[in-house]
């Protein structure tokens, strides 16, 4: 298969959590591919490791986790060319290389939108923060316009008013749309 078709290729992902007395493997030999233009649904029983799998790829597992994989390859498309990133070889989960990918290339929409939204900041500012972080030449006004565009695309009513609201002023579904805007704004 042409590597241009595959965005994410995960091979034999294992995640083990270490406590004082034992090691518990939560994710065992997970493999999958995500193809460009396609949707991948990860389903399973509660507690089966879906969230741990995705958190492992994004490197959100914490210090007591051991994440190992044969390969976690992310293929970014930059200026019509494939740019390969081997996430399994990134040693610092919060280092510059992983931070540069998060938000700009890789994003995750959590089940509970309030876990991603800060209650003391306006939702528009929270979406704009990622844009400004990953687009150094962008002005605050340009970021605001991009946020308004995202809100319109995602069906948030009255975006010109809602951009200056706080998370508690949104329904659960609208909060989810704000988090989706955060995830895709840099694409």
Segments from the language model and where they lie:
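ABC transporter nucleotide-binding domains
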Residues: 1-187
């Amino acid at each position: 298969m042409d590597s241009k078709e595959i965005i994410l290729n995960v091979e034999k992902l294992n995640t083990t959590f270490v406590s004082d007395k034992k090691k518990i493997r939560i994710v065992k030999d997970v493999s999958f591919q995500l193809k460009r233009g396609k949707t991948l649904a990860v389903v399973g029983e509660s507690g089966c490791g879906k969230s741990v799998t995705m958190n492992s790829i994004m490197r959100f597992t914490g210090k007591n986790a051991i994440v190992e994989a044969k390969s976690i390859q992310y293929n970014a498309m930059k200026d019509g060319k494939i740019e390969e990133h081997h996430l399994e070889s990134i040693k610092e989960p919060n280092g510059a290389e992983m931070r540069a990918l998060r938000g700009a290339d890789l994003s995750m929409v959590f089940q509970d939108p309030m876990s991603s939204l800060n209650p003391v900041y306006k939702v528009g500012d929270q979406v704009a923060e990622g844009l400004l972080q990953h687009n150094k030449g962008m002005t605050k006004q340009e970021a605001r316009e991009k946020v308004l565009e995202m809100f319109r695309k995602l069906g948030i009513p009255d975006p010109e008013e809602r951009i200056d609201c706080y998370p508690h002023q949104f329904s659960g579904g609208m909060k989810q749309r704000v988090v989706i805007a955060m995830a895709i704004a840099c694409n």
